[in-house]
């Protein structure tokens, strides 16, 4: 389970300004973002591939719903006003793989996988918020966004001593 850190708190603060009916968090882990979403959305759903993260989340949840699945693969015939993800975004280390932080060889593979599973889950005016790091291949992510005709807007940036985090908003 990924424990909340600077990135989670950064995203939670941004998420707090969004409102709607249905919200989804892909890769909910400890539930920090999901709990923030539950303050401004009527129904919130979190997905995670790690059963133990979800078990921990359920012990602390109020009205959030969680599903153990890969990205948004188990969700059908439902559209969300907001989809949020703080995906694993660090380049993978061949000698030590940690699925809670490793985003693949270019550090964008997991982000792209999450986004691919989310695209058909948005309402017409729905939005996707995703956290990205300058440590990942942002050009590869930009190509994916362009290929899928998504509109990208940078919402916020946070400079840390070891990386720069950005939250981007995607719309169709």
Please identify what each model-predicted range represents.
Residues 40, 99-102, 146-147:
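Glycine-rich, phosphate-binding/catalytic loops in enzymes
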Residues 4-76, 82-85, 91-92:
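Conserved SAM/SAH cofactor-binding pocket of Class I
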Residues 7, 49, 106, 110, ...:
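Soluble or luminal CAZymes and related metallo-dependent hydrolases
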Residues 89, 170-172:
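C-terminal beta-strand of the catalytic ATP-binding
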Residues 110-169:
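Conserved Class I SAM-dependent methyltransferase catalytic core
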Residues 80, 95-97, 141:
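Short aromatic-enriched loop/helix-cap "lid" or pocket-rim segments at secondary-structure transitions
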Residues 87-113:
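Mobile active-site "lid"/loop adjacent to the S-adenosyl-L-methionine
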């Amino acid at each position: 389970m990924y424990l909340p850190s600077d990135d989670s708190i950064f995203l939670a603060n941004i998420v707090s300004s969004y409102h709607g009916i249905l919200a989804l968090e892909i890769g909910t882990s400890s539930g920090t973002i999901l709990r923030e979403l539950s303050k401004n959305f009527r129904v919130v759903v979190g997905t995670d591939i790690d059963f133990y993260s979800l078990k921990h989340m359920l012990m602390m949840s109020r009205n959030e719903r969680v599903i153990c699945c890969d990205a948004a693969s188990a969700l059908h015939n439902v559209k969300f006003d907001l989809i949020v993800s703080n995906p694993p975004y660090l380049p993978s280390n061949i000698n030590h793989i940690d699925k809670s932080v490793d985003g693949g060889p270019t550090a964008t593979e997991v982000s792209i996988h999450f986004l691919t599973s989310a695209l058909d889950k948005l309402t017409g005016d729905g939005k996707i918020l995703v956290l990205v790091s300058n440590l990942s291949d942002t050009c590869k992510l930009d190509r994916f966004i362009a290929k899928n005709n998504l509109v990208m807007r940078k919402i916020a940036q946070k400079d840390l001593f070891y990386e720069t985090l950005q939250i981007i908003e995607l719309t169709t």
